[in-house]
């Protein structure tokens, strides 16, 4: 059947949603973005980390120069432990040297503003369009919003975050298709074990530009990133007393946020600087539950997900937004190839199903590996139990370049737009640390390393005291 023009409806003017709009514009594919908020770039107190794999796509879209105006590249990280021991790592600088892009943070508001203002046709980004209903047709989807507007498209993309209405529609449709047990199992795996107070503070004496501080405590971690003009991006992650299953996860008011902050006011996170001093300098702040999961179901019919709507991770690895950016590039790559191969004809439902399954297959393993890294790191940084406590005190200080190597292996296989030129700024790390160049994943290597640690630790504790045994082991490796 001949069609006028294939159209993609993107629900959510998020980082991933707006990046997809840019990618589709470059690919020549008709699209529209429906954003429920009236402000395309609200200030909610959040920051965003742009790592080389996300930066590379933004550079392809000619947006990274604007990002660079608002960042202070990280060069050093300082890690502090409860007993007063601290050490430094130059892994941020190493990453910059390996990939040609730094690890950098900026206001999430500013990133959204860059994506929104940098888009060439604002009429395609519809604000104040909260989706109220989604109707799946044989050859498309029909979307109705609170304003009464009706949008018809050939593909619906849910870039609408962890509380995604598109994901609910996919679960509903899959359930009707008699996959109820699988959907219930998938939906129940979105869990919450941590909460995060996050915010942005003005410059403080003693916190140097381009540096990051990770203060590790039992059940708590405080992270600060010192950005452009001394602007401090920070988050405090705390272990909760119980495990919640979505959607029964806690929601927090501003009053509850203030109470939680006051409870840790006197905690020193760097030298003699207390969290209370950082809190008093805040420009904006909030508190949220940290959901965790990579869903197995990514699509149904003509509906598909990207970003936090399908994979939600804690902020510790800084890859959440970068994964959404990669999702956008991967989906745009496939849609462009489909458009070229289909010519003037619209692809059949089975062809669309094949394309969306291919998108899921291309992304799932990579996203899930980084998600597992996030699960490991958040528990490591809050010293969640004896193993993580031992690792933070007796493994991390002696790990050398291993943290940089681990990060490099998650960065190197990043997806970019295959129909746009590769950025000129680059480094040898993309090839050296790519999956093709290694036989084991870094998590496998880490598990083998930790298994060896366990055996040696057990043997040594028979002869030495605990601290002496661990120091002896790490001085030998």
UniProtKB/Swiss-Prot annotation:
Binding-site residues for FAD, renumbered to this chain: 35, 49, 108, 308, 321
Family annotation (Gene3D superfamilies): FAD/NAD(P)-binding domain (3.50.50.60)
Subcellular location(s) per record: Membrane
Keyword 4Fe-4S: no
Signal peptide: none
Enzyme Commission code(s) on record: 1.-.-.-
Keyword terms, alphabetized: FAD, Flavoprotein, Membrane, Monooxygenase, Oxidoreductase, Transmembrane, Transmembrane helix
Names of required cofactors: FAD
Pfam family, one: FAD_binding_3
Biological-process GO terms, alphabetical: paxilline biosynthetic process
One cellular component (GO) term of this entry: membrane
Entry-linked InterPro entries: FAD-bd (IPR002938), FAD/NAD-bd_sf (IPR036188), FAD_mOase_fung (IPR050562)
Membrane topology per record: Multi-pass membrane protein
Assigned protein family: Belongs to the paxM FAD-dependent monooxygenase family.
Function (record text): FAD-dependent monooxygenase; part of the gene cluster that mediates the biosynthesis of paxilline, a mycotoxin that acts as an inhibitor of mammalian maxi-K channels. PaxG, the geranylgeranyl diphosphate (GGPP) synthase is proposed to catalyze the first step in paxilline biosynthesis. Condensation of indole-3-glycerol phosphate with GGPP by paxC then forms 3-geranylgeranylindole (3-GGI), followed by epoxidation and cyclization of this intermediate (by paxM and paxB) to form paspaline.
Record protein name field: FAD-dependent monooxygenase paxM
């Amino acid at each position: 059947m001949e069609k006028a023009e294939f159209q993609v409806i993107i629900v959510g003017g998020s980082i991933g949603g707006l990046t997809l709009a840019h990618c589709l514009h470059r690919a020549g594919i008709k699209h529209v973005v429906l954003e429920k908020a009236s402000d395309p770039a609200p200030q909610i107190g959040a920051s965003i980390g742009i790592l080389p794999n996300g930066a590379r796509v933004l550079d392809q879209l000619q947006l990274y120069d604007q990002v660079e105006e608002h960042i202070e590249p990280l060069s050093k990280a300082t890690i502090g432990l409860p007993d007063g021991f601290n050490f430094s790592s130059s892994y941020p600088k190493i990453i910059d040297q390996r990939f040609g892009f730094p690890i950098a943070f900026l206001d999430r508001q500013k990133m959204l503003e860059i994506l929104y203002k940098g888009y060439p046709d604002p009429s395609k980004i519809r604000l104040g369009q909260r989706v109220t209903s989604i109707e799946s047709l044989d050859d498309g989807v029909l979307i109705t919003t609170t304003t009464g507007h009706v949008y018809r498209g050939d593909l619906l993309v849910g870039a609408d975050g962890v509380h995604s209405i598109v994901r609910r529609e996919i679960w509903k449709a899959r359930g009707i298709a008699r996959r109820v047990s699988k959907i219930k199992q998938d939906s129940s795996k979105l869990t919450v074990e941590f909460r995060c107070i996050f915010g942005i503070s003005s410059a403080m004496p003693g916190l140097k530009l381009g540096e990051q501080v990770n203060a590790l405590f039992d059940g708590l971690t405080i992270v600060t990133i010192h950005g452009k003009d001394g602007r401090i991006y920070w988050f405090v992650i705390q272990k909760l007393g119980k495990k919640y299953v979505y959607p029964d996860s806690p929601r927090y008011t501003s009053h509850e946020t203030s109470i939680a902050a006051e409870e840790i006011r006197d905690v020193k996170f760097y030298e003699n600087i207390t969290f209370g001093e950082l809190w008093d300098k805040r420009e904006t702040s909030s508190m949220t539950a940290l959901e965790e999961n990579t869903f197995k179901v990514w699509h149904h019919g003509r509906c598909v997900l990207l970003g936090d709507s399908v994979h939600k991770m804690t902020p510790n690895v800084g890859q959440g937004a970068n994964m959404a950016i990669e999702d956008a590039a991967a989906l745009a790559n496939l849609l462009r190839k489909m458009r070229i191969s289909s010519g003037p004809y619209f692809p059949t439902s089975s062809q669309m199903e094949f394309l969306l399954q291919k998108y899921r297959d291309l992304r799932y393993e990579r996203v899930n590996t980084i998600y597992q890294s996030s699960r490991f790191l958040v528990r490591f940084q809050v010293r969640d139990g004896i193993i993580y406590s031992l690792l933070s005190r007796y493994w991390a200080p002696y790990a050398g370049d291993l943290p940089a190597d681990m990060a490099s292996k998650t960065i190197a296989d990043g997806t970019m737009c295959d129909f746009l030129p590769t950025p000129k700024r680059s480094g040898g790390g993309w090839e050296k640390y790519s999956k093709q160049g290694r036989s084991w994943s870094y998590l496998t290597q880490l598990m083998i390393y930790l298994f060896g640690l366990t055996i040696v630790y057990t043997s040594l504790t028979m002869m030495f005291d605990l601290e002496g045994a661990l120091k002896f082991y790490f001085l030998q490796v």
